[in-house]
Amino acid sequence: MDVTVSQLVELFLQSPLVTWVKTFGSFGSGHQDNLTLYMDLVDGIFLNQIMLQIDPRPSNQRINKHVNNDVNLRIQNLSILVRNIKTYYQEVLQQLIVMNLPNVLMIGKDPLSGKSMEEIKKVLLLVLGCAVQCERKEEFIERIKQLDIETQAGIVAHIQEVTHNQENVFDLQWLDLPDVAPEELEALSRNMVFHLRRLIDERDECTELIVDLTQERDYLQTQQPPSPGKFSSPDSTPSPTSSLSSEDKQHLAVELADTKARLRRVRQELEEKTEQLADTRHEVDQLVLELQKAKQDNIQLAADARSARAYRDELDSLREKANRVERLEMDLVRCKEKLHDVDFYKARMEELREDNIILIETKAMLEEQLTASRARSDKVHELEKENLQLKSKLHDLELDRDADKKQIEKLLEEYMVLEMAQKQSMKESAHLGWELEQLSKNADLSDASRKSFVFELNECASSRILKLEKENQSLQSTIQGLRDTSLALEESSLKYGELEKENQQLSKKIEKLQTQLEREKQSNQDLETLSEELIREKEQLQSGMEALKADRARQIKDLEQEKGHLHQAVWSLRERPQVNSTKDVEKENRALHQAVTEAGSKLSQLELEKQQLHRDLEEAKEKGEQAEALEKELHRLEKENEQLTKEVTSLKAATEKVEALEHQSQGLELENRSLRKSLDTLQNVSVQLEGLERDKQQLGQENLELRKMVEAMRFTSAKMAQIETENRQLEREKEELRRDVELLKTLSKKSERLELSYQSVSAENLQLQHSLESSTHKSQALQRELSQLEAERQALRRDLETLQLTHKQLEGAEEDRKALEQEVAQLEKDKKLLEKEARRLWQQVELKDAILDDSAAKLSAAEKESRALDKELARCRDVGSKLKELEKDNRDLTKQVTMHTRTLTTLREDLVLEKLKSQQLSSELDKLSQELEKVGLSKDLLLQEDDGHGDGKGKTESALKTTLAMKEEKIVFLEAQVEEKESLSRQLQIELQMIKKEHEQLRQTQEGGDKAQNALKRPPGKVTSHQEKEAWEPSHKEATMELLRVKDRAIELERSNAALQAERQLLKEQLQHLETQNVSFSSQILTLQKQSAFLQEHTTTLQTQTAKLQVENSTLSSQNAALSAQYTVLQSQQAAKEAEHEGLQQQQEQLAAVYEALLQDHKHLGTLYECQSSEYEALIRQHSCLKTLHRNLELEHKELGERHGDLQQRKAELEELEKVLSTEREALEREQKTNAIATSENQRLRGELDRISFLHQQLKGEYEELHAHTKELKTSLNNSQLELSRWQVRFDELKEQHQSMDISLTKMDNHCELLSRLKGNLEEENHHLLSQIQLLSQQNQMLLEQNMESKEQYHEEQKQYIDKLNALRRHKEKLEEKIMDQYKFYDPAPKKKNHWIGAKALVKLIKPKKEGSRERLKSTTDSPPWQLEPSDPASPSPSQALRSQTENPDNPPSGPNCVEERDTHNGPVGKGPGDLKPKRGSPRGGSVDRTDTSTDPAVKSWPSEPGSRTFSTSATTAALSSSTPIPKHLGRTKGCNSDDNLCEPSSEPDGPYHRQQASRPNSLESSRNASSNSSPLSLKGSSDHLHSRCESFSSADLIPSRDPATLSRDGNTSGRGLLGRHEYPPPRNGPVSQETIQKKGAASTHTGVRPHSASPSSEMVTLEEFLEESNRGGSPTHDTPSCRDDLLSDYFRKAHDPPALGGQPGPPARKDGAKMPTSFVAPTIKMSINTSEGQQLKPGHYVKPNLRPSEAEALAGMPSRQVQPPQSLSLGRPRQTTMTQNCHMPVSRSASLSRAFSLASADLLRASGPEACRPESPQKPGGHEAAGARETSTHSLQGSHILARERTPIVGKADSPSPGQGTRGRPLDTRRFSLAPPKEERLAPLQQSATAPALATGCSSGSNPQIQHFSPTVAPAVRTKSKVPQHSGEVATVAPVRPGLGTSEGDGGPGHGYSEGLLTKSPGRSSDLPPHVKRGPDDFSQGSSSKSTPASPEPGGDPQTVWYEYGCV
């Protein structure tokens, strides 16, 4: 038996349940045998301890800790355990234990049997079920997971037995459900039937057993009555009761009596209940129907409840996801910020790599130079000898040079004679020009004769000027040849200057590096501050923890007052989280301290590394100092270069590291900011309406950010669609969740009502009502959580959108996602368990209804405690999560620091390796340099032998070539070393062979070059000797012969130079080839570096993963330590409780004695009570019987009495009938018996009826209550439906809002796309125009250099220019005063409403240029014949064409000129400053009445200038002409009466002429002429310049036509200056009235006084200073100065020149060539551009004075009436074409232009807006807006040189459409300044009449297509007015900045304004202008920009500040 028991015990102890129990601490820890272990388990002490851990709720029952094999104590412990398990299952887990409970008696009496072991297994199984489902289930499951796999499987099977098997444990959670699915109902009903059967069977068995036992007891009691004594006699037979004492027998008798009484009661109740059952069955049948209906309602409610439960699960999962998403959001924000930084880092990396490459190259160069210098130091002795020989040769050359100087002096004398002759011719030409001007003033009546006369004079003058120019150029070429010979000797000295410049550059680099070091120091300081902030945050956390502790202490005190007797248990429970949290906080603080210390240590390491690097630098410096031997300056420079390269490499490494740390710190700061922002957004979401409004604002901001993102990251555009779809899906999910939440709310309300109804039913339990109220509070909390979840979901939706982007971009995020999914799975499991717990809590609430009042109170108190504990736990968890996040941040920082340290170590190793490699390379390079030097020496020796008399320049060149070859060798060597180190020797041999071959080739080429130079150098000696021989002959022919010989010699020198340059070019090409190879190798190196960087990133990711694992390990270890600490605390508490328990046991023992005494008394009393009760019952029965008998007897007595009386009365009768009565008596007695029986039955039935009626009333009450309950449910359902309908309405509203926001978002996206496309077009055109500007700047520089040669002419003409400039300045001051007066009347134009007109304009602007060009081509073909007139000399002159067109005024003019004419007439629509009344709705487009409206244009044009700015505001389009051009067109379409008011004839004799010239049509014509020709004029004759500007010479750039005031100003400036008419130009935007301008112009015509400008530009500038500044700054206008001697002659020559300069302001290029005054002579600005005819085209060629017809002609036939027959005759069409083709010559660009261009484009964009196109939207829907679009780019570039000087011109410029923008005409190529197609389309494009170029800007300047409607009625009226012709554009300066430069200013005309506009931009060109023109850019810009501030981009700003912001001279 012992063996079997031991085996059973072993098997039992090896079972998985026991192994699981062993995980609970001390059990089985000691070395005990199996039996003791088993007995310890059976005693129940340890199992009770486990149960205490599972269910820490206090219980009053004390466990017996010292069993000592006592059966009763063991049974007591086990019964306590089973009771606790049962209560825990029912109350906490909401489950019923259906299985038979473990038999405690069997375990206690016979623990070692197999059955008892099975019972113990049951106990362990139930304990396992509790442990797996309790609150600490995670901890217990973790313990189970640590066991073996087999034991785990066994435990899982046991758990399934408890949780899943309904036969063991029955789940009561379905009671919570209002209704259950039919399938589930079936399964439940089957289980219930099965359990019911089993329970009934068990009940029957128990009752039978009780009956048997009672019978046996009664029998025994009857057989053996209890003896009076305590002990029975020893002789008595042994019986079961004999052993019992008398007390026990009494006790048993009392119990038997109790059971009998109970049996009786039970039987009575059973009978009553059977009767009640029969009665209620009928009611049940009636209620079944109602129940079915209720069931259907319940089914629906159950489905809703199920969905609500599912949504609870989802809510929990969503909460977890929200927590997870917060983390992911933080990661996302970091990644986003890093993404933003990635582009910057990429650019920074590329820049640093480029800098590295440059530094490496410079290092290599310097090393080569060092080696070369060392070699040179070896050669010094030989070179000294050569130096002596060269000195002797130099002496000989100096003698030759002296002879050359004498010859040059003779030539200069001859040149002076020629210059004097030229000056005379200039004076004559000036006189002729004056005469022409006089004639033009007096020749209004006879147009044709006047034109022919002007043409003849211009032709004569131009022919003379051309001859003089040719002679001048020939002389200049000879002088240049002589100067080149003298400059050759000075080149060697320049090289030292270059080296010094390089040294300065290197010093600048050193300064930059020092600044970088300072930044690094700052970044280190920032890191220190960061660490301090972290410490502060840690302190804040500590303070927060202390506050939490204080709160907990307060809560503990409150709970102590409430729960006095439970104080110790609650205190122990609350101390645990405090201890744990404090320990965690301390650990985290330690970790943070460690991280901070590690960061500090790493920073110190970085500083140490920097110091080591500095030490390395110092060592390198010392080594460099040792290299000084010979040529100290060269060595010093080389050392500095080497030091710089080393410093750069070291500092770059350090800066990169510091920058990385800075960015990381910035990333952390940004993360903190993002978290704060996210908190703010969550708070904002709480209020839904405000949240929606803020969402709109946020969407707007997000749209802006998206636009920026679209510009910065275009590659994300494809992902946007996916993100939008995901966004919609998320919104749908959000809406579904909202619906679910609403359903949950309704369900919660229903549940509240049900609970209230249940409370009304169970009104007896008041304390249960409190518990139900607490449940309602919980439901409200759930509702709040649901609302919070809605807000969180919205935040999560945004976060998810960003997350999806980052998941696609980042690979590491995918791994994190997988890990997070696993966590989600675990969290979902936990969530399910929590849901089960919640269900159990609900079941507890329902079960408590059945429990007594005391238990309900205890449960409510326990619930309060649990809530407080939950709150505390939630707080602790929040704190723990925050601490965990801080830990993660800290670990990330530590990881980053470790990574930085590793990178530093790797960089150190790389530096060491690179140093070693550089040493090897330097040694190999030294060898190579020695070999090469040997080759160089041999070459030098050969050169000495072949060319003994070569100069030192050849040697320096050969040395440079050798250094270049050495550099190439080094590059090839480095490439080969990177590719293959093994083939190094082979590569070196190949390179040596190549170098030798190259040296041989160089030697051969140099020998040939030296021979050619010798051949060239010999003739000078001969020439000089010949000159000496012939110097004695005095004849002039000999001098000319000498000049011819000098020319021949120069030609020979040029040829030889060309041959040498070709050879040099070949060598450069070879060098470029080698450089390309070097670049390819460097790219390969970069790819390798990228691969290495990728591998490093991979390693970093792996390191981060390992770090994460370490962190997890550390967290687990910390948790383990915390659990062990908790266990120790619990043990100590247990020990204390055991001590208390022992004390209580003693008390219990004392109480037990008292209890036993009381029990005995109770037994006695019980027996007495039973006896009395039995007697009482018997008496009651007797009493009832007696009562019934008494009643019967009384009735009988009464009846008998009555009968007795009757019998006495009838005695006689009765006596007779006694026999009959005797028989009847017998019958009556029988009847009495039957009646007595019937009455008794009747009474019994009446009692039963009363009882049944009472039951019926009770059931009725219940039924009414149920009916009321159903009514309440229906009302609640109706209310919920109403709420649902309200929420649906709300949802529909929100949906509509969302759809509207989606529509607005799509609109914004479209707008963004339009802007991006427009930006791309603008950038393309800007790049194109930049290249053109560069070419123009180069040509301008060349021309300026040519102009500088003739300095004497400058001095002679300087006084005239200065006088005229002074007069103009004075005039400008007057104009400024009047303009400032006009500011008072400034009234900004009302803005239009339609913002989308700008968008339409944008769409049209984006149209391709080709369509516009085609349309313009069609329009040019459709234009009148004068437009495309062939170049036949026999063809009719433009004057004829003009006449023909003026004769037909009704025909609207076609081509671009129509636009300007329409400008003039449709003024009300074009909202320029001059059309205030038209803007306000004046219907008179071009009627005669317009004269009155614009009589005072100064007053009317000024206020309305913002309206004109609206033209320019579409800076994005920047296509429309300036604000001022429009007003004066529109304000004075007729111009007749208004011009009379605009002048003051009293002061000047020329006043009437001024007035007429200021008239509107003339200003229009002059504006056309100026716009088409002005800028080419202003180009100083550089046709190349104009052509290179390509389309940049838009009408805006070329004096756009809308502002005749400005046109007159710019067009006539130069002419006025020459003639003494200093008509002051109006402001660029034309704010000044023409009246004031003409008055001043007239006054200045006679006075000639020079006005002084108050602006800084009024300072006197000498002509030489002006030119020097222009040469230094690179004139942005690209105009090249030419000889000033032919200034006046150039005017006539320019008038005859074709518009090859791109349509210069001369009449031929103007739209209205006929409007040029004949008397006006533009200053000659010469250009050395040769046409195909061999003539040099001068800028002034186009400035032919044209005769201006009447204003009616100007209005009615601007394009048609070109009253310039002489001009058109002199304008050879072939010259037009050739000049346009020559316009492509390249020019150098000044450095300031690029910046000016960027500023211009920025200002244009700043000035833009949707309102910019408002005035133009009705004008020309198709073509014109598109035209403006293309012109923006051209104008922005045209204005780029202008912007360098002045900002305001840009607006005007931007406003005028580019010449190629009008859809009516061919795209105007500003290089040609005509509408003719480009030269690719036609070979003779410019064979038009002289008016063809005028058409060019006619289209462009007339940017306001409203002016199309030309009213011919105005023509006659206007024709009578203008009698004085205008000088339209005779200034050869760059196109004016202002678009509207009209000729309406009297004689000033376009020439003045034009030269002004150009001078503002090109100081270098002013020397060529007349003196009044040379007032400089300052004067004119001050005069113009200060007055035109309303049109400037910064209207409120000071014009002077605007001027100086862009830089004046």
UniProtKB/Swiss-Prot annotation:
Motif (GBA): 1652-1683
Biased composition (Gly residues): 1943-1954
Compositional bias ranges of the Low complexity kind: 232-245, 1430-1439, 1510-1524, 1562-1581
Transmembrane is among the record's keywords: no
Residues covered by the Calponin-homology (CH) domain: 11-131
A cellular-component GO term for this protein: apical junction complex
Subcellular location, record wording: Cytoplasm; Cell junction
Coiled coil: 247-425, 456-1008, 1190-1384
Basic and acidic residues composition bias: residue spans: 1025-1036, 1410-1419, 1681-1697, 1866-1883
Molecular function terms from GO: frizzled binding; G-protein alpha-subunit binding; guanyl-nucleotide exchange factor activity; microtubule binding; PDZ domain binding; protein dimerization activity
Keyword Nuclease: no
One GO BP annotation of this record: protein destabilization
Pfam (any one): HOOK_N
Keywords: Cell junction, Coiled coil, Cytoplasm, Guanine-nucleotide releasing factor, Phosphoprotein, Wnt signaling pathway
Residue positions, PTM Phosphoserine: 227, 239, 486, 1435, 1592, 1798
Region (Disordered): 221-251, 1002-1036, 1410-1716, 1757-1787, 1808-2009
Region (DVL1-binding): 2007-2009
Primary role: Required for activation of guanine nucleotide-binding proteins (G-proteins) during non-canonical Wnt signaling. Binds to ligand-activated Wnt receptor FZD7, displacing DVL1 from the FZD7 receptor and leading to inhibition of canonical Wnt signaling. Acts as a non-receptor guanine nucleotide exchange factor by also binding to guanine nucleotide-binding protein G(i) alpha (Gi-alpha) subunits, leading to their activation.
Subunit structure: Homooligomer. Interacts with DVL1 (via PDZ domain); dissociates following initiation of non-canonical Wnt signaling. Interacts (via C-terminus) with ligand-activated Wnt receptor FZD7; competes with DVL1 for binding to FZD7 and displaces DVL1 from ligand-activated FZD7. Interacts (via GBA motif) with guanine nucleotide-binding protein G(i) alpha subunits GNAI1, GNAI2 and GNAI3 (inactive GDP-bound form); interacts with higher affinity with GNAI1 and GNAI3 than with GNAI2 and interaction leads to G(i) alpha subunit activation. Does not interact with GNAO1.
PANTHER family named among the record's database cross-references: HOOK PROTEINS, PROTEIN DAPLE
Protein's name according to its UniProt entry: Protein Daple
Organism field: Mus musculus (Mouse)
Gene giving rise to this polypeptide: Ccdc88c
